């Protein structure tokens, strides 16, 4: 594609160089210059003839010879490029031909004629100079428009960069906070695990000593008055909420006994001690093992006192606690001393008792109690809400499942914002290069066609403009690459540039695999079509099981596949015409294109045809079918199950992102008034409006497999009840679109002016008429009966249908497509319309075809009441499918021109990148 054609395809004149408009101006200037050249050439020829006649009549004087030579020089000029240079020679000729001042001799007539001719030449030269000035002014004005637009975009780029730059420290702060939390959780887990291991080691060792010295331990328990009493099972059960409350706040206690030191008399007095039953913090593993060991032991009172001490501590008064802590609290080497204390205690117990061990044990209780007191004081400063430990994990999992796929992480949002901003900078840089190259080519073409030397004057003006001199885009690009590399690529600029330029990995499928897949599908489909052809045209379809119901189910699937195929053709047209449909639909072009759609349709069509062939074969064969696992009437249900498995498959196969986009969009359509409406939402709502027949047949499919399939074949229960629920199903898409229109009007409402965009209300009228048509059609079906066209309900239905069709047809041409506009200066004339100038498709004939064919498509609803008259051509069940096919074709045509109009609107507002919501909100008091 030539560069000039590329610039002509840029339909916004104030955005890129108006190459097409300048070419038209050059043609106009060229015609004016050519007319001036003809006039000047005639004058030169006339002067040359006069000079020649003078030479023949008399000997020319030096003055006349000079004049003749000058005149010949003028005539020898070729084109307008030398006219300005020859204007000097012409002025010399006039000065030589004028009569000297003070001379009374009248000038001859031929000299007067020469002077008048020279004046005419000078006037032509002035006109030529005026044309040159006009051409230069038109070019400089175009340069100014481009420069003004570039300055606006450059300012926008700086503002977006400032917003992104503010996000960087917030992201680093959040990441550091998350890292600290992870480290804290890891340390807490390791600490609990190490404590649990040491505790159980000492517990098992003491238990072994207890079994060997049972009698000695009982004597020690009776003599040792300072040892704590054991806890009953009920008391331990009451202490569990306190354990959980401490565990929730991560109050991890380092419980280690201190060195063996002699006790003061005040400390040896056990009367000042107050027993407080507080359970120590333990890990879930510790609690499980304690429960298992409690079940094994029949009597907890037979355990060693050091085992019981982990469940009971003693609390001192504040004075006593400070004295104990100041004298004895030393945690260095606590683990080894703890093990030694346990060993010594066990040995003393075996020898008949040890006072040092008892004192050491009491001091251990003191330190444990002091640490628990501090922890409880810290916990008391926070408000603790009791939670259930059994249902909490289930609730967290449910929340994660419900939020799956809805919100991205802060890092993913920030990366996406960086990519979109980098894409914006690349487009802006291309804008600089394209416009500068366009001006250079236009200047060359202007000098070539007009012969005027304007290059130096215009180029000097271009070089002085900001869009040529500014280097801010390069600086912003390098800055964003550096920031991205430091945040996400470990300082590697090359990797950062690769990630920023390629928003996602392009998975290119091997053409061999694609061709093999197409060949297998084509061969398999051909064989099945031959089988279906044999069954149909051998008049054996009367033997098909429940043919009328199964036909409706398979036809519904076929309509969906046809709609997908037509949509793939639309994507192919948009790709060829450079309509940015992937940006409009907010999807990746690598995963959503016509090739992917055709591949999906091929796979689903093969499954559809296979199911039909198996159903026919099984119906005809009966018990002779080689695989009689599923009855023939359940084959559509199996096909539907396979389709649903593909649609909701959670694995990253079958275009997971596109399937999620489709399901999310359909959900947003069904919940229209709740959320704001995007283009993809009301576009999908319009698609569902054209698939009403498929939706109705799907409802019959549900009714068939929940009611009719268990009853005799000709019971017809669903057919009798269909007249009651079909109107609600038929009006559901129109209702969803009506709610979307109201929501869009609500979103456009301005509280300051008290008004909203009324175009959404006018659009709501169209869908209101559709609902009225459904209501009138239902009343006609219930009350008209045998009256037919003489029934007033039938007439009301016709009036509503005609009104809906004409209003929808007008809305398509004027608003949805915008291909018909009023010419400038004639807005008052309601009968004067023309095609809009900005068009993406060629040739222009397709627009006229769309105008007239859309009117025919909009009137296909008349066939629904003409079925008795048309049954001679096609059976009624086939004619209904034909009407559905026509509606899908109309929707495919509507899609092509609707996306074109949206693309042109985006170009007009310079919407080429998405607005990514930033992860961190900035408060007003933050700088």
UniProtKB/Swiss-Prot annotation:
Keyword vocabulary terms for this entry: Membrane, Transmembrane, Transmembrane helix
Coiled-coil zones: none
Task: State where the protein is found.
Answer: Membrane
Disordered as annotated region, ranges: 54-78, 204-239, 257-305, 326-355
Instruction: One Pfam family, please name it.
Output: SPX
- Covalent S-S links between cysteines: none
**Which topology term describes how it sits in the membrane?**
Multi-pass membrane protein
* Principal subcellular localisation of the protein: membrane
**Residue ranges, compositional bias (Acidic residues):** 286-299
- What's the protein here called? SPX and EXS domain-containing protein 5
């Amino acid at each position: 594609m030539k560069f000039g054609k590329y610039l002509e395809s840029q339909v916004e004149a104030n955005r890129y160089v108006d190459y097409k408009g300048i070419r038209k101006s050059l043609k106009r200037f060229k015609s004016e210059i050519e007319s001036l050249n003809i006039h000047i050439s005639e004058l030169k020829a006339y002067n040359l003839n006069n000079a020649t006649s003078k030479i023949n009549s008399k000997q020319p004087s030096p003055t006349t010879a000079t004049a003749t030579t000058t005149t010949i020089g003028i005539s020898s000029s070729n084109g307008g490029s030398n006219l300005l240079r020859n204007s000097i020679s012409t002025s010399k000729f006039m000065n030589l031909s004028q009569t000297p001042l003070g001379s009374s001799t009248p000038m001859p007539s031929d000299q007067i004629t020469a002077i008048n001719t020279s004046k005419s030449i000078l006037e032509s030269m002035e006109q030529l100079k005026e044309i040159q000035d006009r051409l230069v002014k038109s070019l400089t004005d175009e340069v100014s428009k481009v420069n003004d637009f570039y300055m606006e975009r450059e300012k926008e780029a700086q503002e977006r960069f400032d917003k992104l730059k503010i996000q960087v420290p917030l992201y680093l702060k959040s990441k550091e906070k998350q890292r600290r939390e992870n480290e804290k959780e890891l340390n807490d887990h390791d600490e609990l695990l190490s404590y649990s291991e040491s505790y159980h080691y000492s517990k098992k060792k003491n238990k072994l000593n207890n079994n060997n010295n049972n009698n000695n331990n009982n004597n020690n328990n009776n003599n040792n008055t300072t040892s704590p009493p054991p806890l009953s099972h009920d008391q331990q059960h009451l202490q569990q909420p306190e354990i959980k409350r401490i565990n929730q706040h991560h109050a991890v206690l380092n419980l280690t006994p201190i060195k063996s030191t002699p006790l003061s008399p005040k400390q040896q007095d056990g009367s000042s001690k107050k027993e407080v039953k507080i359970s120590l913090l333990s890990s879930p593993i510790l609690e499980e093992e304690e429960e298992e060991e409690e079940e094994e032991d029949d009597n907890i009172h037979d355990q060693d006192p050091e085992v019981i001490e982990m469940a009971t501590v003693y609390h001192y008064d504040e004075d006593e606690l400070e004295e104990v802590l100041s004298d004895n609290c030393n945690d260095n080497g606590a683990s080894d001393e703890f093990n030694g204390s346990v060993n010594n205690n066990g040995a003393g117990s075996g020898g008949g008792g040890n006072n040092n061990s008892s004192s050491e044990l009491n001091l251990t209780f003191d330190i444990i109690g002091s640490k628990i007191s501090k922890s409880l004081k810290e916990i008391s400063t926070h408000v603790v809400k009791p939670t259930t430990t059994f249902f909490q994990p289930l609730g967290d999992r449910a929340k994660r499942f419900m939020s799956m796929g809805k919100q991205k992480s802060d890092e993913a949002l920030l990366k996406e914002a960086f990519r979109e901003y980098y894409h914006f900078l690349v487009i802006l840089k291309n804008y600089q290069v394209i416009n500068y190259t366009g001006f250079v080519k236009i200047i060359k073409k202007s000098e070539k066609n007009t012969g005027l030397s304007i290059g130096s004057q215009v180029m000097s003006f271009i070089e002085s403009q900001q869009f040529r001199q500014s280097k801010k885009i390069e600086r912003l690009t390098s800055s964003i690459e550096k920031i991205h590399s430091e945040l996400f690529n470990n300082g590697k600029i090359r990797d950062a540039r690769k990630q920023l330029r390629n928003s996602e990995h392009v998975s290119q499928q091997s053409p061999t695999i694609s061709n093999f897949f197409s060949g297998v599908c084509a061969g398999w489909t051909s064989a099945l079509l031959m089988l279906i052809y044999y069954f149909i045209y051998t008049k054996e379809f009367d033997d098909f099981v429940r043919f009328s119901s199964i036909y409706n189910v398979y036809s519904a699937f076929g309509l969906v596949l046809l709609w997908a195929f037509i949509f793939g053709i639309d994507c192919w047209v948009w790709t060829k015409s450079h309509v940015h449909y992937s940006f409009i639909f907010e999807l990746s072009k690598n995963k959503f294109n016509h090739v992917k759609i055709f591949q999906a349709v091929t796979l689903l069509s093969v499954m559809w045809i296979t199911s039909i062939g198996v159903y026919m074969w099984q119906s005809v064969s009966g018990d002779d079918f080689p695989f009689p696992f599923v009855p023939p009437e359940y084959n559509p249900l199996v096909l539907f199950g396979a389709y649903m498995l593909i649609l909701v498959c959670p694995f990253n196969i079958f275009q997971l992102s596109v399937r999620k986009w489709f399901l999310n969009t359909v959900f947003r359509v069904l919940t229209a008034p709740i959320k704001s409406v995007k283009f993809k939402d009301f576009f999908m709502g319009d698609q569902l409006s054209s698939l009403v027949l498929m939706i109705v047949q799907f409802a019959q499919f549900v009714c068939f497999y929940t009611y009719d399939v268990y009853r005799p074949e000709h019971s017809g229960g669903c057919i009798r009840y269909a007249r009651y629920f079909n109107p609600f199903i038929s009006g559901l898409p129109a209702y969803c679109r009506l709610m979307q229109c109201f929501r869009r009007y609500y979103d456009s409402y301005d509280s300051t002016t008290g008004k909203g965009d009324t175009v959404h209300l006018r659009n709501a009228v169209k869908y209101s008429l559709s609902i009225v048509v459904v209501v009138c059609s239902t009343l006609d079906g219930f009350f008209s009966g045998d009256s037919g066209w003489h029934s007033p309900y039938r007439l009301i239905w016709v009036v509503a249908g005609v009104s809906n069709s004409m209003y929808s047809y007008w809305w398509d041409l004027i608003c949805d497509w915008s291909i018909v506009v009023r010419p400038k200066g004639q807005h008052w004339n309601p009968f004067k319309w023309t095609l809009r100038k900005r068009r993406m498709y060629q040739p222009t004939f397709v627009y006229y075809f769309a105008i007239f064919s859309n009117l025919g498509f909009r009137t296909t609803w008349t066939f629904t009441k003409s079925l008795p008259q048309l049954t001679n051509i096609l059976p009624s069940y086939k004619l209904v499918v034909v009407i559905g096919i026509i509606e899908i074709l109309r929707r495919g045509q509507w899609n092509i021109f609707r996306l074109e109009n949206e693309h042109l609107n985006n170009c007009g507002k310079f919407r080429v990148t998405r607005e990514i919501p930033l992860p961190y909100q900035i408060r007003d008091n933050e700088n």
